[in-house]
Amino acid sequence: MGKKRIVFFAYLPFFTIFMSFSFAGITKESPFSIGQTLSSSNGVYELGFFSLNNSQNQYLGIWFKSIIPQVVVWVANREKPVTDSAANLGISSNGSLLLSNGKHGVVWSTGDIFASNGSRAELTDHGNLVFIDKVSGRTLWQSFEHLGNTLLPTSIMMYNLVAGEKRGLTAWKSYTDPSPGEFVALITPQVPSQGIIMRGSTRYYRTGPWAKTRFTGSPQMDESYTSPFILTQDVNGSGYFSFVERGKPSRMILTSEGTMKVLVHNGMDWESTYEGPANSCDIYGVCGPFGLCVVSIPPKCKCFKGFVPKFAKEWKKGNWTSGCVRRTELHCQGNSSGKDANVFYTVPNIKPPDFYEYANSQNAEECHQNCLHNCSCLAFSYIPGIGCLMWSKDLMDTRQFSAAGELLSIRLARSELDVNKRKMTIVASTVSLTLFVIFGFAAFGFWRCRVEHNAHISNDAWRNFLQSQDVPGLEFFEMNAIQTATNNFSLSNKLGPGGFGSVYKARNGKLQDGREIAVKRLSSSSGQGKQEFMNEIVLISKLQHRNLVRVLGCCVEGTEKLLIYGFLKNKSLDTFVFDARKKLELDWPKRFEIIEGIARGLLYLHRDSRLRVIHRDLKVSNILLDEKMNPKISDFGLARMFQGTQYQEKTRRVVGTLGYMSPEYAWTGVFSEKSDIYSFGVLLLEIISGKKISSFSYGEEGKALLAYAWECWCETREVNFLDQALADSSHPSEVGRCVQIGLLCVQHEPADRPNTLELLSMLTTTSDLPLPKKPTFVVHTRKDESPSNDSMITVNEMTESVIQGR
């Protein structure tokens, strides 16, 4: 297979060092050495020796031949690298493939196979290294039966209960160490099967049961999702899982952080079509037994109806792993219909809990009846593509999606529903009495409302509009009250500029009712219209997280549009980081806490909120600080919501702040989660250095901030990049790690940047980091230039560019 072997004896030493041979196959007479490669006949895959992180250690592996950077999909000697340049792969006297480390012995082999003379090893068009017996033609050994961290199309994960065999993926220890890590991916022998990721001996993530074409625990696998997966089970106790290639190079990988990804190459980058776990609710058992994880509504863990926290104090602290217990014990008597009879309460949009049992039922009603008459059945679900599932154990690892998901019916004591009926009766009586009193004042109120109608018509119109947008609890403030509180927007009450306007504080920071507020007054010349104003109100009202700013309400009178926030005494992060005196208040531990807090807020926006929001204007001045210096992401006027499986969008109107905008967004209008990651990388480097991206200049060449960060990292001089005010409070290795994370975030290609879950993992663990590529998109303003000189860029003929200077 492949090209003929090149034999050119006079120059053999030169080519062994400086270029690779194309190799046809491995036989006993022609062993395979460092510097040689073996290609599949279709030219897609290649076998050879490679090193990681410029190390002297060599590994024998398979990779995509024409894709740069190199993507390794299988490693033979992942636990024991070779270090001798004389290392080779050959066929031993007993007929097995073995990898020897020169004079240092054997480091890897296929084991005793006893192949006949003339047998050979080849690389198939599917990326499978096979060892074929010449006489029988049988495949004696193949790499597809010894998986690493990657599943290729036509390779298989499987289990066989009779033979006691199971085959799954094992993550690398780190990006630069292919030895087995702590995560393993398997398919379970349950009926129906499901995929699980194990972290050591404990479950870390599961896909939910398989329903013919999809995993029920993945909301992105809705009816519109074209599943690449195939999972089959037979009556002999075996199961097989694989995925199909749809015309483009693809792979499924278990990362060293424990994330399963399906990646497809589009000719330029690897695009992710599936990821799990995708957010914090996907982590196994996060809410404990009978706990329900609802990622979009904090706190994310709740108890099912009829259940209460097992340990209330711990639950309030956010320690949910102990789960919930029944408020009313069951008194099951099979088919009882009396006052002690059990009932079922149905919850929609559910990821089916773990430890399910398949029950043979023809339809949902039969499934219901079978569970009702079985006292050990605690819940049931009838799922298209599966049928009837029942649960007799604790409901574990259950979450609720904002859309998609299954119906789960939970057995409760009838009294649990009767309590609600009594409450409804009391509420109805109270409402009736209240309405009677209200109508008694209606005549007087009608006259007064007519008098004030004109003054409030604008607010009422906006109130109606906002109510139609499902924005609950939003307060509408009177213009007179705001003008009085801010001394008619006097300069003495001005806190500073904000996105699309100025921000003011109330006198003494308070309204007459004692509340501390800040008022964002939108400028009529700012370019922010109804859409951006609505964006900010709707998004901030629906998003609730400790690292996001909280909006109290709004006020609209004529041309005036005001947003009312809770007042944060420490203003924005830039007033500390870039101020020679105030920066001393933020030592390195505090800055790192701020960095981590921003990342957690970003994770909520991208993965944990039901809206899935891309901020598009993440920068230091848009990070507010409360009295304890906790960061709050603000200014959502430019934010966009993503739906379903959408991962990117393209706009004709590129808006944002120069220097923080990713290359693909600035020049083509394409934005995604990775655009915010780029902005975070710039923000991170600014926090570390105490320097502005828009005005920093270093050396005679006038290097910009990203270029200087790259230079310091390459020369392991990260301490030079650090703000000197942090010299005594920082640790060099921690600073170096953060600089490297920042550089990973600002890589030119979106596919090279970490996603938000990976970013937070990098910040909160000490696992090895991948090596960043040199940033190629560098915006720089010389000190003798006004920032506005660089504030306008042309994206394309169809794009209106509105770039806001900091």
From Swiss-Prot:
Catalytic activity, as annotated: L-seryl-[protein] + ATP = O-phospho-L-seryl-[protein] + ADP + H(+); L-threonyl-[protein] + ATP = O-phospho-L-threonyl-[protein] + ADP + H(+)
Intervals, Cytoplasmic compartment: 447-806
Name by which UniProt lists this protein: G-type lectin S-receptor-like serine/threonine-protein kinase At1g61430
SMART domains on file: B_lectin (SM00108), PAN_AP (SM00473), S_TKc (SM00220)
Modified residues (Phosphothreonine): 651
Organism expressing this protein natively: Arabidopsis thaliana (Mouse-ear cress)
Membrane topology per record: Single-pass type I membrane protein
Keyword flag Cell inner membrane: no
